Each structure stands twice: as C-alpha cells, then as structure tokens.
C-alpha cells in the first residue's frame, strides 16, 4: 500500500510539473482507443475501455492541477464527491454495459443499465434538492481549461516583476530596472507582460448556480426522471413500441420548454441548454424512428458521399460499419 502511495505521489508531482506532458498522455490514450476499434475480436469493448480510461485520466489530472493552482470548485467537499462519482458513472457506463452484455447476456446488460440509471438519478436528485445545484451539466465536472489557467499562474508569478517596472512620464515607455531582470537564458526581449484575467475563466470559477423556482425545479426533475420512465416504458411496452420513444421525447421537450424561460443563466448553464437542444436531434437516430425512417436515408447519404466526394470515404465507410453497433448500445443512444 505504501508503494502505491509513493507511486501516486510521484505521478502527482509529474502532472504538476509537466501539465503539457500530461495532456499529451491523455491525447495519446484517447487516440489509441480510435485505432483499436475494429482491429480484432472484442476490439470494440477494449476500445471503449481505453476511451473510458482516457476520460478518467483527464478527471484525475484536472483534480491534481486544480489543487496545485488553488482552483478548487466553488462548493462543499461532499458535493464535489457526488459530482466526481456522477462523472465516473458517465465515463464508464458504455463500457460497463458492453462488458455486462459480454459476460451475462442481455438480461445482465439490462440489469446493469437500470442500476446505473438509478444511481445517476439518485445522485442528481441529491444535487438538485439537497445542494441546490441548479441545472445539471454534462459532464458534471467541466474539464479544466488548462491553457488559460496555467497562463494565469504564470502571470501571477510575474506580478512582482511587473510592479517593479515603471512608465516614463514623457515617453510613456515601460522600463524594467536592471536589478529585476531575469537570467539571460529566460530573458524576454519585449515589454513586461500585463496580467490578463479571462472573464470566462473567472465566471466559471466563481459563478454560483442560478436559483430554480418551482417551475424550473419541476422541469429539471422531469429531465432527471426521464431515463427511468423510459426504461419502465420499455419494460412494459417492449422495444418495438412507439410509446417509450414518444414518452421520452415529450418529457425532454417539456423540460426544455420550461427551462428555456429562464433568462439569467451563467455561461455553463447556457452551454448545457444548447447541448440539450442539440441532443433532441438524437431522436432521429433512436429506435423505432431510426429503424423505420432514418436508417435507409442516412446510409444512402453516407454511401453517396463515400463514392462521389474525394476523401469523405475515409470517414463515411467506417461510420456505416459502426452504426449498427452504435444502435445496439443503450447508453450511446439514450444515456
């Protein structure tokens, strides 16, 4: 156990001192997940495992960097833990579904799906009603904007040097005294840089969730309950019935309509509302609508583009092969 602790401490130090290398590692792991897909048997499961690992790696590294930059999330420790667990569930849900189907068959797969959706609904209800977290975002913990954060840290470290410079009264030139100059190797041959603070960064760090009234709370509750109601409808009416598709769509549209009346949203909440509006288009790709109407048209369009538009085939043909697999995964479609 002590050995694992030392290894983790070394890894934390590595991330703190080399954030660019950590980002490169995350990108490499994610690219590896794309390269694995379709290469051999069970490649889709392994590809999804690697992709989930890349997301968890980003979550871990962001947590390390936030501590190093003193950029803690504006909430209690218990709320942060709930958000972290919710993020982990969202990152691994597809792989867990695929693994359950492989190990325990269709019955085990649906049991795992129901358990994950119940766990997510419980966590979101706690965040909504106990912690008053407002509109739930996805992912629950927004990834750290490392470029702006690290740039802000560099500017803070140079603040003393900036204070020691002065501006000539007549010429208006910014002059740095010789005593405050850095070493020759790290010297910059330009004007001292001014401290820049990103408005978006400050808003993201310090803005509190927009308080929800009764109407908005009902709307968000509908959004949280939608997956469970959809699963219950699937169990009662069957996979080929239109009723689960219609019920889910009505709940999502109702929730979105009630929330769209809110005006004073912060930046993250506005982004979440745009994401939810875009995800309404997913109903064109969800069965039974996809099976009866969308499938033939989408495949025809992809085949036409692959045959007649140079270069598009590199993307269109793998997409045509992957669409049937994508349709079989619940969390790809309905998660």
UniProtKB/Swiss-Prot annotation:
Superkingdom, natural source: Eukaryota
Segments on the Peroxisomal side according to the record's topology features: 102-109
Localization: Peroxisome membrane
Cytoplasmic side: 1-80, 131-335
Biased composition (Acidic residues): 155-164
Region entry Required for peroxisomal location, spans: 66-81
Record carries keyword Ribonucleoprotein: no
Family the entry assigns: Belongs to the peroxin-16 family.
The protein's role, per its UniProt record: Involved in peroxisome biogenesis.
PANTHER family: PEROXISOMAL MEMBRANE PROTEIN PEX16 (PTHR13299:SF0)
Protein name, UniProt field: Peroxisomal membrane protein PEX16
Organism, as annotated: Danio rerio (Zebrafish)
Taxonomic lineage: Eukaryota, Metazoa, Chordata, Craniata, Vertebrata
Gene this chain is encoded by: pex16
């Amino acid at each position: 156990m002590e050995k694992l602790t030392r290894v983790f401490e070394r890894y934390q130090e590595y991330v703190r001192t080399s954030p660019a290398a950590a980002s490169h590692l995350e990108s490499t792991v994610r690219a590896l997940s794309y390269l694995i897909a379709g290469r051999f048997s069970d490649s889709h499961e392994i590809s999804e495992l690697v992709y989930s690992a890349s997301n968890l790696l980003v979550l871990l590294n962001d947590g390390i960097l936030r501590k190093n930059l003193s950029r803690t999330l504006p909430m209690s420790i218990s709320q942060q833990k709930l958000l972290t667990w919710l993020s982990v569930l969202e990152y691994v849900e597809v792989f867990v579904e695929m693994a359950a189907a492989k190990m325990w068959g269709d019955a085990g797969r649906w049991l795992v799906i129901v358990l994950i959706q119940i766990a997510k609904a419980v966590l979101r209800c706690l965040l909504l009603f106990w912690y008053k977290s407002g509109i739930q975002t996805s992912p629950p913990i927004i990834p750290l904007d490392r470029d702006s954060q690290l740039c802000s840290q560099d500017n803070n470290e140079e603040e003393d040097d900036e204070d020691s410079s002065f501006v000539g009264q007549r010429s208006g030139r910014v002059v740095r005294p010789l005593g405050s100059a850095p070493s020759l190797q790290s010297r910059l041959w330009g004007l001292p840089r001014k401290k820049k603070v990103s408005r978006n960064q400050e808003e993201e760090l310090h803005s509190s969730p927009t308080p929800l009234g009764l109407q908005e709370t009902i709307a968000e509750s509908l959004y949280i309950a939608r997956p469970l109601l959809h699963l219950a409808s699937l169990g009662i009416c069957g996979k080929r019935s239109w009723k689960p598709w219609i019920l889910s769509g009505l709940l999502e549209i109702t929730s979105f309509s009630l929330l769209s009346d809110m005006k004073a949203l912060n930046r993250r909440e506005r982004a979440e509302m745009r994401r939810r509006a875009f995800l309404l288009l997913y109903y064109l790709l969800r069965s039974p609508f996809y099976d009866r109407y969308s499938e033939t048209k989408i495949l025809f369009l992809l085949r036409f583009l692959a045959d007649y538009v140079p270069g598009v085939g590199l993307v269109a043909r793998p997409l045509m092969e992957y669409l049937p697999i994508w349709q079989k995964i619940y969390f790809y479609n309905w998660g």
